[in-house]
């Protein structure tokens, strides 16, 4: 698959507008800003100079001067897979704003500080952000040379699922399976992973597909307890809606930090697209559903290095975003977004505001 042509400036314009909204120079946006401690969002540099006005339309390409991209591709390295992750929600936050998404947290992993939270410990549905934990548990549950053969477990995949395009008889390696979970958010991959791993965990190849998937779900809940995500309970590997499959924004932040300890996950999370050849010889083209890392996307965020999106009618629009700047790692979780563009706009604004605060403190 060839890279897409770069779109002109839509993200740049919106991000500049977000910066000015953050400073209070412009009123009115998809979300209302009540206060941001000075200084606010750092100015963009365009052709070497700070951008000083809002442009509604630009016809010529705009060059943005930023730090070396390699710095943005560094990933978090704070997670110990066997250690509880503690996130304390304070009474007040450095970032104050009113957002339309229902459940939000911005967590500075490096300084162990919550910069913003909204209903962060309230019950929410994770949708496909579930696959962050699916991938971590999978890696720990199977030998690294496991061959995943797609089979009858495809019958468990709910109608209307996001898919990696797997067919019965396809054979994938463990790295390919992680990519199938993290890039196209394949529910087919999630069930092949869960059923294969469930039988390995139980040491019982005779388990039915449903029984094996249930074993894997049990292991996921054990992991949730181990990392301190005690307000979460998972029943399925793909995150398709189930009333008993739930989480909180704070718990999803813990899962993001936990996942940072797995190179297979962090390496997959920064891939924009991939053409993969299965062990069985078939090929597939996968695009990452996380548009923060697409440099051709309106939602592109230069410093992003992950992590996972999700959406169901019940969960709303969700994203667990990770980014690195100023030697700090941020996790921004949005669950219950009312629309896709609101999810992305609020994520971009929160990341910029978080790094602006970090820069000055």
Model-derived segments and their meaning:
Residues 1-15, 20:
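N-terminal Lys/Arg-rich, disordered targeting/topogenic segments
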Residues 8-9, 22, 37, 51-59:
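Eukaryotic PEST-like, Ser/Thr/Pro-rich intrinsically disordered regions enriched for SP/TP/PP repeats
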Residues 15-16, 108, 127, 308:
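Catalytic-site microenvironment of enzymes
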Residues 17-31:
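Hydrophobic membrane-insertion alpha-helices, especially the h-region
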Residues 29-43, 355:
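Hydrophobic single-pass membrane-insertion segments
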Residues 39-42, 54-250, 259-260:
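Active-site-adjacent loops and short helices of periplasmic peptidoglycan-processing enzymes
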Residues 43-49:
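Short, low-complexity, disordered segments immediately C-terminal to signal peptides
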Residues 229-230, 241-251, 256-361:
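Domain-terminus/edge residues, biased toward the C-terminal soluble/receptor-binding domains
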């Amino acid at each position: 698959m060839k890279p897409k042509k770069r779109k002109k400036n839509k993200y740049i314009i919106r991000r500049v507008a977000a910066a000015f909204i953050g400073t209070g120079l412009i009123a009115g946006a998809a979300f209302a800003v009540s206060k941001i401690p000075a200084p606010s969002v750092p100015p963009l540099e365009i052709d070497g100079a700070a951008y000083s006005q809002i442009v509604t339309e630009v016809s010529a390409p705009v060059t943005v001067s930023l730090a070396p991209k390699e710095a943005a591709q560094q990933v978090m390295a704070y997670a110990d897979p066997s250690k509880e992750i503690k996130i304390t929600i304070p009474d007040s936050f450095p970032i104050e704003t009113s957002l339309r998404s229902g459940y939000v947290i911005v967590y500075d992993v490096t300084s162990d500080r919550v910069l913003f939270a909204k209903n962060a410990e309230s019950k929410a549905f994770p949708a496909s952000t579930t696959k962050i934990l699916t991938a971590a548990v999978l890696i720990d549950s199977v030998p690294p040379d496991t061959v995943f053969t797609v089979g009858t477990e495809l019958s468990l995949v709910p109608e209307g699922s996001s898919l990696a395009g797997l067919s019965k008889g396809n054979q994938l390696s463990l790295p390919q399976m992680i990519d199938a979970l993290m890039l196209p958010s394949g529910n087919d991959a999630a069930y092949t992973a869960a059923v294969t791993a469930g039988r390995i965990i139980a040491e019982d190849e005779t388990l039915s597909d449903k029984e094996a998937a249930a074993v894997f779900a049990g292991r996921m809940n054990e992991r949730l307890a181990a990392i301190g995500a005690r307000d979460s309970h998972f029943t399925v590997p793909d995150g398709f809606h189930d009333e008993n499959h739930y989480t909180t924004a704070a718990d999803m932040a813990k899962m993001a930090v936990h996942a940072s300890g797995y190179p297979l996950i962090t390496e997959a999370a920064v891939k924009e697209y991939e053409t993969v050849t299965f062990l069985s010889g078939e090929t597939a083209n996968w695009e990452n559903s996380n548009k923060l890392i697409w440099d051709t996307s309106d939602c592109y965020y230069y410093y992003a290095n992950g992590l996972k999106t999700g959406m169901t009618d019940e969960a709303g629009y969700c994203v667990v975003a990770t980014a690195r700047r100023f030697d700090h790692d941020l996790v921004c979780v949005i669950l219950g977004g009312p629309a896709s563009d609101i999810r992305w706009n609020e994520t971009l604004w929160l990341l910029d505001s978080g790094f602006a605060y970090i820069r000055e403190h």
